[in-house]
Amino acid sequence: VTVSVLARTRARQWPLATAAAACLLSFIAFWVAQRLAHVNMLDVMVYRAEGETVRAGGDLYAMRATSANLAMTYPPFAGLLFVPLTFVGVPLMRTLATAGNLLLVVALVQLSLQLVRPSLSGTRLWRAALLVAAVVVWCEPVWTTLRYGQINLLIAVAVLWDFTRREGHRWAGVGIGLATAVKLTPGLFVVFLVIAGVLQWRRERRWNQWLRTAATATAVFLGTTLASALVLPYDSKRFWTETLFETGRVGFAEETANQSLRGVLARLMHTDDPGLWWLVVAVLFGAAAMALAVRAALRGDKALAVVVCAITALMVSPISWSHHWVWCVPLLVLLVDRRDRVRPRWTVGAVALVFASFALWWVPHDPGRPELDQNAGQMLLSGVYPLTIAALFVGYALTRRPQAVAKE
């Protein structure tokens, strides 16, 4: 269904009002489904507790919130951003968080379409965005993001906003800088921008869009981080010297929800710490994937470069919860747009099915940590996102190689 809607959106001339109505009906059904599922929006409750701790002048990184005893894992700047959540009651906060995330789904799709097909604009762009949003809201990463009240959609939108600005735009880089100040992982985009920018500078010997965006992102990140240090000096010192290196406070590596290479290896090796094996695999994969992203950027394929960089961050991060994978939305948009070049032809549908299937939750998962004793079939299901990406990368390499030989 997802692939069908994405593929035909451009051809079918739906009136904008009809597309908006379809999206609204889907979102209402989604809202009702989440209420019937009794979602607890656990993470937004943690965000609220972090904001309350900042207002009370407490210790951010000693704080524990909710019945799950969850700790603060983001930089101090995030705590400052969460203060406004304390100005409204919990029921209203949950409603606003859900409504805001639904709007961000539309924004994410709209920016993904702009990134992949810059010529799409005006009514055609918004019609497509609304129709696609009506479908992708039901995929597992988006569902889980709204279930917990997470900020993944906001992070992705901030990053994509930068990459869809026209060349030379003065504010390009602000989104990446702010996103990195909140969650650190988007900092890989800065690394990508610097590498691509330096290589292009060596070729042309002039300042370019990649370096400009990297400089802006770095300045925004440093500015917000320093400002946070002035407001929260103790918390800032503790985070950057201690908490940053305490990966265990985020969660167990082997958890089914951890859809990173480290999670796959932890379950494969029946351990909570895959150690050096993960580091080697992450470095090798990260280097190869970043080389692909930079190469795509230098030949003008910004969409492929951005999507590959985002996926790389998810793969090599120590913990990438399934709800972090909202980047499946621009990935699917890219695959559908280039479906004529994807082999085998059923690949696009298979990838869409992976993210819509909730397959990773089909295996035993509970506080007793059954993931440490998975069988082969359970390992395949619980590693479905990273394994799908690995298959896509291998398939891309195999299909590109014959093309390169043919050109020679």
Residue ranges and their predicted role:
Residues 176-179, 216-221, 305-311, 345-357:
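Central hydrophobic cores of alpha-helical transmembrane segments
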Residues 336-408:
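Aromatic-enriched
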Residues 170-194, 309-316:
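Membrane-interface alpha helices of multi-pass inner-membrane proteins
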Residues 322-336:
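Hydrophobic/aromatic-rich transmembrane helices and adjacent perimembrane loops
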Residues 165, 190, 194-197, 201, ...:
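Solvent-exposed, amphipathic alpha-helical segments
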Residues 159-162, 185, 246-248, 332-338:
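Alpha-helical transmembrane segments and their membrane-interface exit regions
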Residues 2-171, 197-322, 374-378, 401-408:
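Primarily membrane-embedded glycan-assembly and transfer machineries that use lipid-linked glycans
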Residues 173-176, 237-241, 326-330, 344-350, ...:
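A cytosolic-side transmembrane-helix exit/cap motif
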